[in-house]
């Protein structure tokens, strides 16, 4: 018989476990499978779906399917195994993507972006965090693991259309969308949603040769009338050491520093006294405002679900000094009926040699930042970088393929198991939504083992 685990909180899927005696399987494995949410048992003439609520309580669905009862119109005949396991989406084998069709998944479903030293975790609602090399010591953006509601803090884009404010990934405003789709691909994620005639598409990926994450926002006015929109970006900076960032408040609330030049926000906390690196968040167009103070952007007694600056339709041009620095751009967008406009946001990490830290007293050397940003100013440049990323993964996954009679085996072996293994190898399981990345870091044994 085939035993399929589908624990949505578990990072790994074990496709096949074989056992001769069902009751032995129950008695022996129930103790170690309590964390799994659901599994299906297949027998020669029936299958059994089991939902584990807690160790003492099981919900069991049994469907008999004997040869005598089967007909060509049988519901079971026309139903695939995946129909039970994919309530929230499906695999797209042609594009090697998993398509999530609702933002309201049981838990955040995340993808890993990055192949070399710069990594970003992104959920199906645009939550997540970003780091360079080490998720503890070089964390760019904050993430609160036990936050309520879950998965708040990420790389958010707010779209204000009159009195309606919404996000392409649904969170954090949770405004009901007219359509929603998230495609987690190999090294990238794409979000497509719409509200009141405006369609938004966001492509997020980490290019191969630069320490940055690209988010390409495409807005299309599908209505019959002109639209006046405002777009607000939002990331919250981590003060680099993610462990200390969550504890040492008496110091941390006094250290945040930023600079703003043109359309780029520079996060330079501790750059003056102890660091040779800073972070940037930029957009490839003239901005109509910005905020770098979280309190100024969100407002008193508010959260990311209802920022005061977005509600008012105007950023305050705040300059953070201590407290909680953020990066937010405001872009006012006029869209004629049928018109499309694209904006490219870049979140990046920059290092300077000790003798090249400053361009003048108290002003960071931005040369390397500007050189990197110059590579991602046009749609053609982004498309070229994205094509290079896809080509890299294509040649990597093509080194070993199988062609079996079972499409699920082909899908798992040719794409998702290999992708999972490479992500695990790159990060040594050091960072996820359940392994915070602030413990022992990249373990040597784990790296060798993976």
What are these language model-derived features?
Residues 21-24:
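Alpha-helix boundary/capping motif
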Residues 56, 61, 68-447:
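Anionic coordination/interaction segments
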Residues 13, 28-29, 38-45, 49-79:
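Short, positively charged and aromatic/hydrophobic N-terminal segments
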Residues 450:
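RNA-binding accessory domains that recognize and position tRNA/RNA substrates
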